[in-house]
Amino acid sequence: MCGRTSCHLPRDALTRACAYLDRQGRRQLPQWRDPDKYCPSYNKSPQSSSPVLLSRLHFEKDADSSDRIIFPMRWGLVPSWFKESDPSKLQFNTSNCRSDTIMEKQSFKAPLGKGRRCVVLADGFYEWQRCQGTNQRQPYFIYFPQSKTEKSGENSGSDSLNNKEEVWDNWRLLTMAGIFDCWEPPKGERLYSYSIITVDSCRGLSDIHSRMPAILDGEEAVSKWLDFGEVSTQEALKLIHPIDNITFHPVSPVVNNSRNNTPECLAPADLLVKKEPKASGSSQRMMQWLATKSPKKEVPDSPKKDASGLPQWSSQFLQKSPLPTKRGASSSLLDRWLKQEKEDEPVAKRPNS
């Protein structure tokens, strides 16, 4: 399943990260609808608003179905036929939609038949693994493997954000297949909401959870899913399957509380700092070896922090993906990415300042 995500990029940066080629092969930036409803966050939960990609044809009859817009929608689909005046009175959970029952439940079958397909945007999503023999659960942050060029991140200023010809070479957003619908209350404005489609977990995630989002890996998959004018429902559903091209790392339990919205939510955590080394044997030797390979911790429950106030980590904390990935590059990029966020944050908003 998928019950928590991160999508913290500023609006302009998110726009650039979603640049695409139109049907004529021209690079385009998606236009926004209701941009003021977008609230960046490291810790998004159901019933909050999240940005989704969808075809412009849903709103403009003369538009090309390959043209895209970004639209912040409520997470948790409210069916168009819902009769109550308050969406919170919906008696069933629609934050996720199982791929194997998508054509059996009217809440999802009806909007899917109308071509209401969308792509949910996120830095990545969180999942919790139940620790054996305890009631505790360890959170993980799951995302696309990241590559990093030498120029990456150097052109993230406002000038480059307005240049649609400049290729985005920073964090690769996770693109998840979704279904949306439009509900009209007795009074008030229309409510657009979505559900994330889920599939069986891939081999690399099966130890964490049995389900995962249906991830659209690559521009072709995203384009086909969105283009309901040219791609039929039957063809689009062929894109819904587990993928192995993901990586993940453990994170702090601070993410457990959805009210916590800081970079610490997705920063890699060292699980070993919570374990006491044994007095003798291989475990002690392993702990001694790790102590020579990684910086000492200030306190037992948290990673050491550098001058920027953010936790330090190394690629040893990134978990294995079934396919070869550049884990060092992913960790290094995430490190620099979070440090840049800290540097760009207004001084007045920083804690203890």
Swiss-Prot record:
Swiss-Prot/TrEMBL site (Required for sensing abasic sites) positions: E127
One GO cellular component, as annotated: replication fork
Compartments reported by the entry: Chromosome
Active site: C2 (nucleophile), E127
Record text on activity regulation: Formation and reversal of DNA-protein cross-link depends on DNA context. Catalyzes formation of the thiazolidine linkage in presence of abasic sites in single-stranded DNA. Mediates the reversal of the thiazolidine cross-link in presence of double stranded DNA.
Site feature location: Required to stabilize abasic sites: H209
Residue numbers spanned by region Disordered: 292-353
Chain positions found as Thiazolidine linkage to a ring-opened DNA abasic site: C2
EC number: 4.-.-.-, 3.4.-.-
PTM info: Ubiquitinated; the covalent HMCES DNA-protein cross-link is ubiquitinated, leading to its degradation by the proteasome.
Gene Ontology process terms (BP): DNA damage response; double-strand break repair via alternative nonhomologous end joining; interstrand cross-link repair; positive regulation of isotype switching; protein-DNA covalent cross-linking repair; proteolysis; somatic hypermutation of immunoglobulin genes
Ranges of Basic and acidic residues composition bias in the record: 295-307, 336-353
Quaternary state and interactors: Interacts (via PIP-box motif) with PCNA.
Role of this protein: Sensor of abasic sites in single-stranded DNA (ssDNA) required to preserve genome integrity by promoting error-free repair of abasic sites. Acts as an enzyme that recognizes and binds abasic sites in ssDNA at replication forks and chemically modifies the lesion by forming a covalent cross-link with DNA: forms a stable thiazolidine linkage between a ring-opened abasic site and the alpha-amino and sulfhydryl substituents of its N-terminal catalytic cysteine residue.
Family, as annotated: Belongs to the SOS response-associated peptidase family.
UniProt protein name: Abasic site processing protein HMCES
